[in-house]
UniProtKB/Swiss-Prot annotation:
PROSITE patterns: CYTB_CTER, CYTB_NTER
Record GO terms (molecular function): metal ion binding; ubiquinol-cytochrome-c reductase activity
Gene coding for it: MT-CYB
Binding partners and assembly: The cytochrome bc1 complex contains 11 subunits: 3 respiratory subunits (MT-CYB, CYC1 and UQCRFS1), 2 core proteins (UQCRC1 and UQCRC2) and 6 low-molecular weight proteins (UQCRH/QCR6, UQCRB/QCR7, UQCRQ/QCR8, UQCR10/QCR9, UQCR11/QCR10 and a cleavage product of UQCRFS1). This cytochrome bc1 complex then forms a dimer.
Species lineage: Eukaryota, Metazoa, Chordata, Craniata, Vertebrata
The species this protein was found in: Trachops cirrhosus (Fringe-lipped bat)
Protein name per Swiss-Prot or TrEMBL: Cytochrome b
Length: 379
């Protein structure tokens, strides 16, 4: 008799995706981040669901409802900090996942890559709207500053901003709609994740060498299920340590003050995972130019497959490209640091140099070095 997991209409989809899936035999730990992102999404949806049961999306009660969750709800503090720090873990895994794709040439699966970029934008939008919900000082002013950027769009900008606000300033209507969208988006993200996996399973996984692995495949279960479970345990241990010992490490103290439209905080800055993009935005002294640079800092990933000049897919055997890749990582870390600093000399200059370097490396240096490596290998 054939196993039920291979015949049942629903089980056979799960079977072909997570059990009998033929997988390259040499995947490193960098391939763990996909499953870790799935765990992060599940944690965020579950904690978010329980938080939404106690949260009120009204300007007069939002801040107090979060305080009520932390003080009066059973394990409410834990739910709140799991959700807030879970977002940080989500972005750590996201950036590692994208970095893996860049390093090993996974972007050559263009459908999977493009859905991934849409997912990145969606998760960033969700996180931004979630940061507004506690209605602290940084929530309010972050919402005001970031939504105001849309006013840089010629002709329709001002109308667009007022349409998003639901009035002439960030107020009750804004908070209510942000809560509605923040609740909705993770479910759209879940659907897109399915599409992401669908496209991935059309081609099969890439591997560290970048060489087709059709001749050497192993079943996903038990080899990679056990490997993924180890990764999950490590990540959940790190998240638990963060939540239980340093819950406010990555947050902003200003957000413990209720939103006050009459008092601007001295330094308005987003959560740490947006600081690199914020630094790029601030490094251009023109409003529209800054907004374009901000969007392009992520959208640039979409043209990476077109700029692939090397005859080899992965960077595993390309030391010059490896140097450039790690330079890019250091530039991004520099931008993250600059994004959290005040707008004054020398931070402004460092931010401008790092922003220019970021785009130069991705758009010009990497394709050039790929061609140089081809020449050196007489290809």
């Amino acid at each position: 008799m054939t196993n039920i997991r291979k015949t049942h209409p629903l089980l056979k989809i799960i079977n072909s995706s997570f059990i009998d899936l033929p997988t390259p035999s040499n995947l490193s730990s960098w391939w763990n981040f996909g499953s870790l992102l799935g765990v992060c999404l599940a944690v965020q949806i579950l904690t978010g669901l329980f938080l939404a049961m106690h949260y009120t999306s009204d300007t007069t009660t939002a801040f107090n409802s979060v305080a009520h969750i932390c003080r009066d709800v059973n394990y409410g503090w834990m739910l709140r900090y799991l959700h807030a720090n879970g977002a940080s873990m989500f972005f750590i895994c996201l950036y590692m996942h994208v970095g893996r794709g860049l390093y090993y040439g996974s972007y050559m699966y263009s459908e999977t890559w493009n859905i991934g970029i849409i997912l990145l934008f969606m998760v960033m939008a969700t996180a931004f709207m979630g940061y507004v919900l506690p209605w602290g000082q940084m929530s309010f002013w972050g919402a005001t500053v970031i939504t105001n950027l849309l006013s840089a769009i010629p002709y329709i900008g001002t109308d667009l901003v007022q349409w998003i606000w639901g009035g002439f300033s960030v107020d009750k209507a804004t908070l209510t709609r942000f809560f509605a969208f923040h609740f909705l988006f993770p479910f759209i993200v879940s659907a897109l994740v399915m599409v992401h996996l669908l496209f991935l399973h059309e081609t099969g996984s890439n591997n560290p060498t970048g060489i087709p692995s059709d001749s050497d495949m192993i079943p996903f279960h038990p080899y990679y299920t056990i490997k993924d479970i180890l990764g999950m345990l490590i990540m959940l241990t790190a998240l638990s340590a963060l939540v239980l010992f340093f819950p406010d490490l990555l947050g902003d103290p200003d957000n413990y003050m209720p939103a006050n439209p009459l008092n601007t905080p001295p330094h308005i800055k987003p959560e740490w995972y947006f600081l690199f993009a914020y630094a790029i935005l601030r490094s251009i002294p023109n409003k529209l130019g800054g907004v374009l640079a901000l969007v392009l800092s992520i959208l640039v990933l979409a043209i990476i497959p077109m700029l692939h000049t090397s005859k080899q897919r992965s960077m595993m055997f390309r030391p010059l490209s490896q140097c450039l890749f790690w330079l890019l990582v250091s530039v991004l870390l520099t931008l993250t640091w600059i994004g959290g600093q005040p707008v004054e000399y020398p931070y402004v200059t460092i931010g401008q140099v790092a922003s220019i370097l970021y785009f130069l490396i991705l758009l010009i240096f990497m394709p050039l070095v790929g061609m140089v490596e081809n020449y050196l290998l007489k290809w």
